[in-house]
Amino acid sequence: MEDTKESNVKTFCSKNILAILGFSSIIAVIALLAVGLTQNKALPENVKYGIVLDAGSSHTSLYIYKWPAEKENDTGVVHQVEECRVKGPGISKFVQKVNEIGIYLTDCMERAREVIPRSQHQETPVYLGATAGMRLLRMESEELADRVLDVVERSLSNYPFDFQGARIITGQEEGAYGWITINYLLGKFSQKTRWFSIVPYETNNQETFGALDLGGASTQVTFVPQNQTIESPDNALQFRLYGKDYNVYTHSFLCYGKDQALWQKLAKDIQVASNEILRDPCFHPGYKKVVNVSDLYKTPCTKRFEMTLPFQQFEIQGIGNYQQCHQSILELFNTSYCPYSQCAFNGIFLPPLQGDFGAFSAFYFVMKFLNLTSEKVSQEKVTEMMKKFCAQPWEEIKTSYAGVKEKYLSEYCFSGTYILSLLLQGYHFTADSWEHIHFIGKIQGSDAGWTLGYMLNLTNMIPAEQPLSTPLSHSTYVFLMVLFSLVLFTVAIIGLLIFHKPSYFWKDMV
């Protein structure tokens, strides 16, 4: 009788527990399969594109950017897929031939059509930002500047993209967007967290790089000063990016891009020339070039040196002397007046330099040509190499660099000397802080410059607050799924083992 009772209890318990375990196991298996299939289902590529045209003083470049749509608020996900340099000068040179602007832009806009899938054309934003060349034109005539921009807008509106307008950006904007670009690409705005720690850590002790930009008509310096009040409100910008506040110093020196600085130097030096011959230390020995006086005074940058000369043309004759060239350039910087605790030049406030700087655009292109972009090259070594380069005869230079256009080749002595003068005497870098200047062309395949920062700002892809993210990474998620599956499997095994316990186990339950 007792054996029968024990058998009935065992049978009853076995059936019920097995039913529960079996049902739970089936549900768990179905759930795991469903999650696994859903998680690993191949998804179509969901990307977005953006186009920015950099209408500079000497030329226009078109940049195409691409990013995954679902990650557009993450740091560093936007990358450059194409750069197209428009053939010809900057748009400010089309004042007297605005009807040619459409043809001027055609090749690069057609290239954009080819690169971006047709299905994406209508939702791809196009922005054109004009910089110092157009700022100078607007100083001469706002009407002429508006006419050029109107024709540019009409031309770009004819393409199947989402044209967002053309405008002249301020020097302050140009500096700020360049700063945003290099720090975005370097990942300086992101903050990583260790899996086993609730304390965040930075990839680098210095949170941001400073930005040094040199164009044809202006130069910008932008950085976050450490423990220093920005004494001039016009040079102060506040950003809140990814949940962190940045107090940024920026200034754009109009007329101090390398091309306009050369025009300034020539206009200054010709004032003291005894005749129509200008012996110039910033050009190689043996170099000669005739310059029209009318061309010299075309730009607003030379107005302060304008005077009536007894000749219509003058000839530059190079003598190739770095030290004399350097001294001539320094005369462009007024350091006698400073209404603040310290200044760069021309009475412009400049806080103490802090940390690393990325130097791009013409800073990079000139130094790369001179083979001086290596971080191991000291400032003293750069100066010595510039002395030797400038002293080389023009005929020898032409032979050594036969593939370079003479217009550009002839100006590298001046440009290299100007960069040294600007960085050392203009911005007050020293031999020690020179080592913190990084001459940058591209970062992870994207050009260093203001265009990416401009697009990121206008498309609101840099949020003020850190975007929300899933609490677990994909690998952690998979690990936990496997772990819980093993736990479920172990419980099932234990349950089965229970039913194989000796008979006295079941007696105790009765």
UniProtKB/Swiss-Prot annotation:
Topology within the bilayer: Multi-pass membrane protein
Catalytically driven reaction(s): a ribonucleoside 5'-triphosphate + 2 H2O = a ribonucleoside 5'-phosphate + 2 phosphate + 2 H(+); a ribonucleoside 5'-triphosphate + H2O = a ribonucleoside 5'-diphosphate + phosphate + H(+); a ribonucleoside 5'-diphosphate + H2O = a ribonucleoside 5'-phosphate + phosphate + H(+); ATP + 2 H2O = AMP + 2 phosphate + 2 H(+)
Known regulation of activity: The ADP and ATP diphosphohydrolase activities are decreased by half by sodium azide. The ADP diphosphohydrolase activity is inhibited by EDTA. The ATP and ADP diphosphohydrolase activities are inhibited by sodium fluoride. The ADP diphosphohydrolase activity is inhibited to a less extend by adenosine 5'-[alpha,beta-methylene]triphosphate and of about 80% by AMP-PNP.
Positions on the Cytoplasmic side per record topology: 1-16, 500-510
Location within or outside the cell: Membrane; Membrane, Caveola
Tissue: Expressed primarily on activated lymphoid cells. Also expressed in endothelial tissues. Highly expressed in placenta, lung, skeletal muscle, kidney.
One GO term of the biological process aspect: ADP catabolic process
Enzyme class: hydrolase
Cysteines joined through disulfide linkages: C84-C108, C255-C301, C282-C325, C338-C343, C390-C413
GO molecular function, one term: IDP phosphatase activity
pH dependence of function: Optimum pH is 7.0-7.5 with ATP as substrate, and 7.5-8.0 with ADP as substrate.
PANTHER family: ADENOSINE/GUANOSINE DIPHOSPHATASE, ECTONUCLEOSIDE TRIPHOSPHATE DIPHOSPHOHYDROLASE 1
Primary role: Catalyzes the hydrolysis of both di- and triphosphate nucleotides (NDPs and NTPs) and hydrolyze NTPs to nucleotide monophosphates (NMPs) in two distinct successive phosphate-releasing steps, with NDPs as intermediates and participates in the regulation of extracellular levels of nucleotides. By hydrolyzing proinflammatory ATP and platelet-activating ADP to AMP, it blocks platelet aggregation and supports blood flow.
Family as reported in the entry's similarity comment: Belongs to the GDA1/CD39 NTPase family.
Protein name: Ectonucleoside triphosphate diphosphohydrolase 1
Species of provenance: Homo sapiens
